[in-house]
Structures are given as structure tokens and as C-alpha cells.
Amino acid sequence: MDPSGPGPSSAAAGGAPAVAAAPQPPAQLSRYESQKRRDWNTFLQYLRNHRPPLTLARCSGAHVIEFLRYLDQFGKTKVHASGCAFYGQPSPPGPCPCPLRQAWGSLDALIGRLRAAYEESGGTPESNPFAARAVRIYLREVRDSQAKARGIPYEKKKRKRSQAAQPAGVEPSGSSSAAAAAAGGGDTGSGGGAAATTTAQPGGSGTAPSAS
């Protein structure tokens, strides 16, 4: 064999030429993560505009409460004053001059997102101003006052027991049909299921987080 002759091609020696992998697009953030990022950026902007200037390291629970009160100007929830004729009515029959405020549920969700964003940005749980006791007390006061003013009680929903207590020796309803379906390989998709209930938090707009 002539050593000066052409050698085997790289394609033949190593198989098919390597193809550069296309860059993967960045993973799309979930709705929660996107909202958390917007809320965090809004809070940082609030600190930059604060007078006197305020840094995140010096931020306390009192500053967080001040921020929540600042957000009231962007609220969309009518909160009746104690002297209003519609005070305590969940469905007032007409308009009134009472101001719009941030709903308690929106503020509560906002604080939860900011509390998580603070620690994700390097803060420690011990120094987290969004987890301060003063903030929890403030949110509780907002909840109670809005419940009275709007006539809408805020109560924790108790999970209903999936099955009522059955007498001894009595088979729960539906178990025989489920067993028959399992034995015969039948389609169980047509069976009744519990409907899931979701509660959507209203979103905000403009320069403030979606806490309205």
C-alpha cells in the first residue's frame, strides 16, 4: 500500500460528522414565578425612590407595612368607611364616595411572594422583613376591618370528609361498581369525581404589583 496515497476520510473513520446541537430556548417561567419577579422588581424600585433612601439590608417590617399602604392607591376593592350607609353590606345597591383599597387576599398573596423572593435573593429567614411579626399583625387587622366593612367574613375553609361514617358491615356506595370495573377492565372515566375548586387572585396593572 502506498503510504503517500490518500488516507481514509474522517467521515469514514469516525462515522457521520458531528452536528452542533442547537441552543435550547430558556425555560419559560410559570405564572407564579413571573409575578414574583415583577413584585420583587417593583419593591426594589420602591426602595430606590424612597425618601430618605433605603437599602434592602436596612428594610424592616415597618417599611414593608409602609409599602403595603402605598399600594392602596392602586387598589380596586371598595372598602366602606364606618359612617357609610353601605357599611357591612356585601352588595351595596348604589355608589358611594368610599375609597378603593387593596383587598386583603391580594396583599396576603403578595407578601408570600415577596417573602420567597427575598430569601431567593440571598436573604436569610431570620432577617426577612416580609416575615416580621408586625407585618402579620397588620395583615390580620386589614382582614378583620375589611370583613366588617364589606360584610364578607374571611374564614378558613375546612376540608370535607371524603366519605361519611359508614355503619359496621356496610360497604360504601360505589365500591362494588369500582370492583366490577377493575375486574372487567371497564372504563372508569365516566364515574363521578369531586370537582376541584380554585380561587383566582385578582391581578393588578400599572406600576404596582398585581395586588388589587
UniProtKB/Swiss-Prot annotation:
Keywords of the record: Developmental protein, DNA-binding, Nucleus, Transcription, Transcription regulation
GO molecular function list: DNA binding
One Pfam family here: ALOG_dom
Motif stretch (Nuclear localization signal): 156-160
PROSITE patterns for this protein: ALOG
Cellular component aspect of the GO annotation: nucleus
Region (Disordered) residue spans: 1-34, 148-212
Span of domain ALOG: 31-158
InterPro entries listed in its UniProt record: ALOG, ALOG_dom
Low complexity: bias regions: 1-22, 173-182
Biased amino acid composition, Gly residues: 183-194
Any one biological process term the GO annotation gives: mRNA transcription
Main subcellular location of this protein, as a coarse class: nucleus
The protein's role, per its UniProt record: Probable transcription regulator that acts as a developmental regulator by promoting cell growth in response to light.
Family as reported in the entry's similarity comment: Belongs to the plant homeotic and developmental regulators ALOG protein family.
Name of this chain's protein: Protein G1-like7
